């Protein structure tokens, strides 16, 4: 009986150590994830298409659920190149520098994936970030406009 208990203890301890090793995130990865989100936000405000593009996976899907006056919802989406083109057009430059909110919070990281909350002046983004070819890039964005201030 003691052998079984000892063996279970060893197996359980090894499982915990493996799980812990997989969930440990390096400071370098945390910094790279944060920088990716900042490239996205700051690239928008600066109308810097190259910086925006650097932050995005080429197959990015950016989505928002919009609800019309009748209460019917639809899903609108754009891809990476559309977002880069909007960035280059300079829409972000309409936000005064002192109003440019750029709050980044890493919500979770596991292996080569991360979830990040990015708060901008007019909207909140939930980013899915992945390490692709050694570089952290945004793969998915689900976003919502902030209510208009009166």
Which residue ranges define each predicted feature?
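N-terminal, post-signal-peptide region of Sec/Tat-exported proteins
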Residues: 45-85
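Compositionally biased, proline/threonine/alanine/serine-rich low-complexity intrinsically disordered stretches
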Residues: 10, 22-24, 150
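Positively charged n-region of N-terminal signal peptides that target proteins for export
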Residues: 1-5, 22
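Bacterial N-terminal signal peptides
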Residues: 6-15
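Short, low-complexity N-terminal intrinsically disordered segments enriched in polar/charged residues
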Residues: 19-50, 54, 58
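Surface-exposed, charged secondary-structure patches
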Residues: 65-66, 74-123
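Short beta-strand edge/turn micro-motifs at domain boundaries
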Residues: 115, 124-149
């Amino acid at each position: 009986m003691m052998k079984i208990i000892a063996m279970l203890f060893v197996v359980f301890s090894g499982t915990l150590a493996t799980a812990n090793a997989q969930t440990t995130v390096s400071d370098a990865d945390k910094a790279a994830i944060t920088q990716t989100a900042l490239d996205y936000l700051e690239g928008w405000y600066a109308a810097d298409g190259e910086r925006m593009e650097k932050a995005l996976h080429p197959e990015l899907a950016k989505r928002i659920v919009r609800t019309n006056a009748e209460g019917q919802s639809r899903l609108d989406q754009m891809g990476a190149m559309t977002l880069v083109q909007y960035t280059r057009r300079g829409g972000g430059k309409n936000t005064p520098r002192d109003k440019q909110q750029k709050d980044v919070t890493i919500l979770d990281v596991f292996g080569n994936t991360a979830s990040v909350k990015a708060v901008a002046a007019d909207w909140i983004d939930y980013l899915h970030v992945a390490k692709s070819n050694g570089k952290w890039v945004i793969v998915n964005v689900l976003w919502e406009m902030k209510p208009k201030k009166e």
